[in-house]
């Protein structure tokens, strides 16, 4: 029997459906019969936007979980899943209306049966409406009220009347981020808030500090991302820890990560027509 293959915190099952044999793993306690409610989430893991330490009273924080009513059967599924796949932080397990349990790990969604004998990864399609239920759920779970983003920590760029608004997490060494900037060059009437997110290479932190501490961060940022002009050295107390903490809270694993005023988000650079449609 082939087993699963994982890659980092963002787990990647290479096999869509596989069997976890009961002879190999012992099952957990039998679950009580629930009434179809969603499972409870464990306490939120939150970080302050004013530092890299756990949040203190009064700090702005973002939840990575939604409030859920108790469901003992889903709790039992979560316990069994944790026993069989040690080392993975299961965000929540929820009962679905189609006879499976939804297992959330960060922004990833998997599906399993009550005994965690089978695990499925991939899009779940509503056969009647042809809707991608998995994608809809991921978008809902990862949505963030735009007005709650700490935009004072972002580099602000305005074109035209600035009426269309989006926020982006970007690393200065991100090729796809530079591709996004080339797309934005052809667009008008837009405001872009950039959260500098140095995660890709050792000198990313140096570059974001030089950009943030410049006399005109928006110009220096554009000169680097569009024209390849390296930022001049600058010194100040750049909020690097706050950027990284915010990204962790919002489960940003790569760049660019685009947040729209509607509350939706997209990972990756979009072609112009798709970007226009979302703004």
Swiss-Prot record:
Residues 33-44 have a biased composition (Low complexity). PROSITE patterns: THIOREDOXIN_1. Keywords: Disulfide bond, Periplasm, Redox-active center, Signal. It holds the Pfam family Thioredoxin_2. Disulfide bonds join 174-177, 213-236. Its main location: periplasm. Residues 1-31 form the signal peptide. GO terms for cellular component: periplasmic space. It is found in: Periplasm. It comes from the Bacteria. CDD domains: DsbA_DsbC_DsbG. Residues 33-73 are annotated as: Disordered. Required for disulfide bond formation in some periplasmic proteins. Acts by transferring its disulfide bond to other proteins and is reduced in the process. Necessary for extracellular secretion of the pertussis toxin (PTX). Belongs to the thioredoxin family. DsbC subfamily. This is Probable thiol:disulfide interchange protein DsbC. The lineage of its organism: Bacteria, Pseudomonadati, Pseudomonadota, Betaproteobacteria, Burkholderiales.
């Amino acid at each position: 029997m082939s087993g699963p293959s994982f890659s980092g915190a963002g787990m990647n099952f290479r096999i869509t459906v596989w069997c976890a044999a009961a002879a190999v793993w012992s099952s957990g306690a039998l679950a009580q019969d629930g009434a179809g409610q969603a499972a409870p989430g464990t306490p939120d893991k939150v970080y302050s936007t004013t530092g890299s330490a756990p949040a203190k009273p009064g700090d702005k924080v973002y939840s990575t979980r939604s409030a859920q009513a108790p469901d003992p059967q889903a709790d039992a599924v979560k316990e069994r899943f944790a026993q069989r796949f040690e080392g993975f932080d299961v965000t929540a397990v929820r009962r679905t209306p189609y006879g499976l349990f939804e297992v959330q790990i960060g922004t990833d969604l998997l599906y399993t049966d009550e005994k965690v004998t089978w695990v499925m990864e991939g899009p779940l399609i509503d056969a009647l409406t042809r809707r991608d239920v998995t994608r809809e759920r991921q978008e809902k779970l990862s949505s963030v009220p735009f007005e709650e983003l700490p935009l004072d920590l972002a580099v602000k760029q305005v074109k035209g009347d600035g009426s269309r608004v989006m926020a982006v997490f970007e690393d200065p060494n991100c090729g796809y981020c530079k591709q996004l900037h080339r797309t934005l060059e052809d667009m008008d009437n837009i405001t872009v808030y950039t959260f500098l997110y140095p995660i890709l290479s050792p000198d990313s932190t140096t570059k974001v500090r030089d950009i943030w501490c410049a006399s005109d961060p928006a110009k220096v940022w554009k000169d680097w991302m569009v024209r390849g002009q390296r930022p001049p050295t600058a010194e100040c107390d750049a909020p690097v820890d706050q950027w990284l903490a915010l990204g962790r809270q919002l489960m940003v694993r790569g760049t660019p990560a685009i947040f729209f005023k509607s509350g939706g988000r997209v990972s990756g650079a979009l072609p112009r027509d798709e970007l226009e449609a979302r703004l």
